[in-house]
From Swiss-Prot:
Region (Sialic acid-binding motif) location: 164-180
Pfam families: Stap_Strp_tox_C
Subcellular compartments: Secreted
Keywords of this entry: Secreted
Protein name: Enterotoxin-like toxin X
Gene3D superfamilies: 3.10.20.120
């Protein structure tokens, strides 16, 4: 269902070009120059390609761990077999609720507002289940793709003003997994996430 977990230089450069992101100057045609100027330009070109520091091994391992966990399309007997965990405009059944995920991804100063929602049965679920389903929906748009940890939070908002915050850079805490939430009481899910430009393939 998902792309193999990988981050190749060609994908990185393609992603940068597709987003129109430029670091340290603008792309253009260099004027004719002597050898010393050409060498200087070559160094600048290499610097432009290195848009961020290479992530350390521990960060890469954590991103992979998060991807491996949240990319699974099943959790406690619930599954995405009917594609209810990704965007849908299908009419709802009487026992279903559609929860809208509203927010932004910020990439190198550019803000994206992807359109998404999830469709759940009206029932009491655990925070572990809800956390998994919501992050699964975000992975379908690129969360945890690449080698850098995202920054920012995902917030589950209830109709009575309650909030449950999910920190995108780490797993849900064990002591919160069994918190019970009625899906019919959820108002929406909001998010404000910042992704590494190196890891963006789709938003």
């Amino acid at each position: 269902m998902f792309k193999k977990y990988d981050s190749k230089n060609s994908i990185v450069l393609k992603s940068i070009l597709s987003l129109g992101i430029i670091y340290g100057g603008t792309f253009g045609i260099y004027p004719k120059a002597d050898a010393s100027t050409q060498n200087s330009s070559s160094v600048q070109d290499k610097q432009l390609q290195k848009v961020e520091e290479v992530p350390n091994n521990s960060e890469k391992a954590l991103v992979k761990k998060l991807y491996d966990r949240y990319s699974k399309d099943t959790i406690n007997g619930k599954s995405n077999k009917s594609r209810n965990w990704v965007y849908s405009e299908r009419p709802l059944n009487e026992n279903q609720v559609r929860i809208h995920l509203e927010g932004t991804y910020t990439v190198a100063g550019r803000v994206y507002t992807p359109k998404r929602n999830i469709t759940l049965n009206k029932e009491v679920v655990t925070l572990k289940e809800l956390d998994h389903i919501i992050r699964f929906a975000h992975i379908s748009y690129g969360l945890y793709m690449g080698e850098h940890l995202p920054k920012g939070n995902i917030v589950i908002n209830t109709k009575d003003g309650g909030k449950y915050t999910l920190e995108s850079h780490k797993e849900l805490q064990k002591d919160r997994e069994n918190v019970k939430i009625n899906t019919a009481d959820i108002k929406n899910v909001t998010f404000k996430l910042v992704k590494s430009v190196n890891d963006i393939e789709q938003v």
